[in-house]
Swiss-Prot record:
Organism domain of life: Eukaryota
Classification via SUPFAM superfamilies: Obg GTP-binding protein N-terminal domain, P-loop containing nucleoside triphosphate hydrolases
Domain Obg positions: 1-159
GO CC terms, sorted: organellar chromatophore; plastid
Family under the similarity heading: Belongs to the TRAFAC class OBG-HflX-like GTPase superfamily. OBG GTPase family.
Protein name: Putative GTPase Obg
Gene, per the UniProt record: obg
Keyword GTP-binding in annotation: yes
Gene3D superfamilies for this protein: GTP1/OBG domain (2.70.210.12), P-loop containing nucleotide triphosphate hydrolases (3.40.50.300)
Subcellular location field: Plastid, Organellar chromatophore
Native organism taxonomy: Eukaryota, Sar, Rhizaria, Cercozoa, Imbricatea
Enzyme class: hydrolase
UniProt KW keywords: GTP-binding, Hydrolase, Magnesium, Metal-binding, Nucleotide-binding, Organellar chromatophore, Plastid
Principal location listed in the UniProt entry: plastid
Organism the protein comes from: Paulinella chromatophora
Length: 329
């Protein structure tokens, strides 16, 4: 499935139905009074979070949405039928913003959560409303009002509690595959991960936590370089970041600084998020090199440095333990 996490759409609530002019027509009542009914209200536009959806792909093919118009009024003071509401399903984690101003209108994070986004127009009044002592045969009625219309920006931010970050080829996809049952694409070239990978990892109490592996960050990612910037929004909701560093890289400290700098440049509090720094692929290092590199990274990051090998199960389990401790579980 193609992963689409942004969409621009236009929504139109329904127009209210018109009121009508009508008079009572009954036998032996030659001068029946006004009986024109009111128009029905236009349908509203409502967003609803759906846990079965994972992407905004549907909005690539349909971008304009209309709720149903209200029906015109009827004789005998009968009101027109209101237009049906239009319910638009979106994935959990979708933010809805006004396209022009960027103002956040709603954040749909829970299954079945709804957001009323555009109200239908009021129905017009029938001539029955305009009967008075001075006007016993009113011909006046009003038209239904137009419904609200909004240009909208939809943004999907994945609901993951732990984000795995690092430069391209740091081993993030391998790690999330070992931590969970996720099966990400893995190969020895940059940007193997072209979309965020999600994996559910089970805690000791049996509950699961969602991990997200986003495409690798490079220098300038916060300004649009590479692939990372488009997906940094997906770790905005995380409680913890796992920063993975490839021990076979030429300059580990430089790699650490690059990613830390991009978190600062991106903003949204990512640089202040609790994190664990992990040195991966340690099977390639001697004991002395491992100690040296760990010390250097600790001095720059101020964090405890964990060392793991994806080939050694015990190191993966140790990392899980550290993550649970950080999350308070």
């Amino acid at each position: 499935m193609q992963f689409i996490d942004q969409a621009r759409i236009m929504v139109y609530a329904g127009r209210g139905g018109d009121g009508i002019v009508a008079f009572r027509r009954e036998k032996y009542v030659p001068a029946g009074g006004p009986s024109g009914g009111d128009g029905g209200r236009g349908g509203n536009v409502i967003f609803e979070a759906d846990s079965n959806l994972q992407t905004l792909l549907d909005f690539k093919y349909k971008r304009i949405f209309y709720a149903e118009d209200g029906n015109r009024g009827g004789p005998n003071r009968c009101s027109g039928v209101s237009g049906s509401n239009l319910v638009i399903k979106v994935p959990c984690g979708t933010e809805v913003r006004h396209l022009g101003s960027g103002i956040l209108l709603g954040d749909l994070t829970e299954p079945s959560q709804q957001l009323m986004i555009a109200f239908g127009g009021r129905g017009g009044l029938g001539n029955a409303h305009y009967l008075s002592n001075r006007n016993r045969v009113p011909e006046k009625f009003t038209l239904g009002r137009e419904g609200e219309e909004w240009p909208l920006q939809l943004e999907l931010k994945l609901l993951a509690e732990v984000g795995i970050i690092g430069l391209p080829n740091a081993g993030k996809s391998t790690l999330i595959g070992n931590l969970s049952a996720a099966k990400p694409k893995i190969a020895d070239y940059p940007f193997t991960t072209l979309i965020p990978n999600l994996g559910a990892v089970y805690r000791p109490n049996g509950d699961s936590i969602i991990f997200a592996d986003i495409p690798g960050l490079i220098l300038g990612a916060a300004n649009g370089a590479g692939l990372g910037y488009d997906f940094l929004r997906h770790i905005e909701r995380t409680r913890l970041l796992v920063h993975l560093i490839d021990s076979s890289a030429k300059d580990l400290v430089h790699d650490l600084i690059v990613v830390e700098g991009e978190l600062i440049a991106y903003g949204h509090g990512l640089a202040d998020r609790p994190r664990i720094v992990v040195l991966s692929k340690i099977e390639l290092l001697s004991g002395e090199e491992l100690h040296q590199f760990s010390q250097a990274l600790r001095m720059v990051s101020g964090c405890k440095i964990l060392v793991i090998s994806s080939a050694i199960l015990s190191s993966i389990e140790f990392l899980k333990t550290q993550i649970w401790q950080q999350l308070g579980t």
